[in-house]
Swiss-Prot record:
Membrane topology per record: Single-pass type I membrane protein
Residue positions the entry lists as glycosylated: 150, 189
Subcellular location, record wording: Endoplasmic reticulum membrane; Vacuole membrane
Lumenal side: 18-267
Signal peptide residue numbers: 1-17
Name the UniProt record assigns to this protein: Protein big1
All ranges on the Cytoplasmic side of the membrane: 289-311
Transmembrane regions: 268-288
Keyword annotations from UniProtKB, A to Z: Cell wall biogenesis/degradation, Endoplasmic reticulum, Glycoprotein, Membrane, Signal, Transmembrane, Transmembrane helix, Vacuole
Role, per record: Accessory subunit of the V0 complex of vacuolar(H+)-ATPase (V-ATPase), a multisubunit enzyme composed of a peripheral complex (V1) that hydrolyzes ATP and a membrane integral complex (V0) that translocates protons. V-ATPase is responsible for acidifying and maintaining the pH of intracellular compartments.
Length: 311
């Protein structure tokens, strides 16, 4: 009974350790931040990451993009959907990753800190927007994406949309512009994330701001295919304004992915699950075999040759 109690505690600890948490990324061209190395690009302390984000946003004349993607996991980056994001992460002088964060990033506090240091303009957008104003200096763009699906096919499509949307926004930057990119996530159905969602009044005000940014043009008439850029005339300045377009794809939802433990625990893959089952059978078998072998008793003269009978 005592051995079964110990086994239960060990299994419970393993399952708790494999429970999914939310990664947070920071990419920046801020010269004040130290250049990243293999040892300094990964952080395990949320406060260290938050301090680095505050320092990155404290520099004026910098374009900042904050993306909230609920349900994003570390193993999503092994699917090959983030080719543009990976390219930017390799090219950025400073990058920081908080792989396992159980706390949602407070973007409002980051924006408030940036406003205290610089005269910045803040734009809040929802994932349903089909047009985004371009990134520019002294502007913070906060995008709230829709929750990721648990179905593998639909999830892969959403991850590709996120990467393409990021590429479209990043393409609006000037070649010598300084920028910060923060990608935050939160577990699905997390009550703490409810405060980050844009309400109806704020979204309506942001929609009006987008129209003003486009110079009064109707973006619906100039809708582009996904992954393209549009250069639209700005009626206020008479110049060309680059606009990033984003369209939500419509994919059929198919349930051909992993379910159960494989979706709730990010490291609990089918391969590891089969390994655990094999160990559950092999280890007790080996233990019993060793006990049986050790219990075999052989007399001292068992292997002696029989004596010849004397006539």
């Amino acid at each position: 009974m005592f051995s079964w109690s110990i086994l239960f505690i060990v299994c419970f600890s393993l399952v708790s350790a494999f429970k999914d948490t939310s990664p947070i990324f920071l990419f920046s061209t801020n010269s004040k931040l130290p250049k990243s190395s293999d040892d300094s690009s990964i952080s395990t302390c949320p406060m260290m990451f938050f301090d680095a984000a505050i320092e990155a946003l404290s520099t004026c004349n910098t374009a900042t993009l904050i993306i909230h993607q609920p349900g994003l996991e570390v193993n999503d980056f092994q699917l090959g959907a983030f080719k543009h994001l990976k390219r930017v992460s390799l090219q950025s002088p400073y990058s920081l990753l908080l792989p396992y964060s159980k706390e949602s990033l407070d973007s409002q506090e980051l924006v408030h800190s940036a406003k205290q240091n610089c005269d910045v303009e803040v734009v809040y957008l929802g994932g349903s927007f089909n047009a985004f104003p371009p990134l520019q200096n002294d502007r913070i763009t906060v995008v709230y994406m829709n929750e990721l699906s648990n179905e593998s096919y639909h999830r892969s499509a959403q991850l590709m949309e996120l990467d393409e949307m990021f590429y479209n926004l990043q393409s609006t930057l000037e070649q010598d512009a300084q920028w910060n990119v923060i990608i935050a996530s939160s577990p699905l159905n997390n009550s703490d994330f409810e405060g980050f969602k844009v309400d109806a009044n704020e979204e309506e005000a942001n929609a009006e701001f987008v129209i003003q940014t486009l110079g009064g043009l109707n973006s619906g008439k100039s809708a582009l295919q996904h992954g393209q850029l549009a250069s639209l005339p700005d009626q206020n300045e008479g110049s060309q304004t680059t606009l990033a377009m984003h369209q939500t794809r419509k994919h059929p939802v198919t349930d051909n992915g992993a379910t159960g433990l494989f979706t709730e625990y990010q490291f609990f893959t089918p391969g590891l699950y089969m390994g655990y089952l094999a160990l559950a059978v092999l280890v007790p078998t080996l233990f019993i075999s060793c006990r049986l072998l050790s219990s075999i008793q052989i007399s001292y003269h068992a292997f002696d040759s029989p004596r010849r009978k004397q006539l």
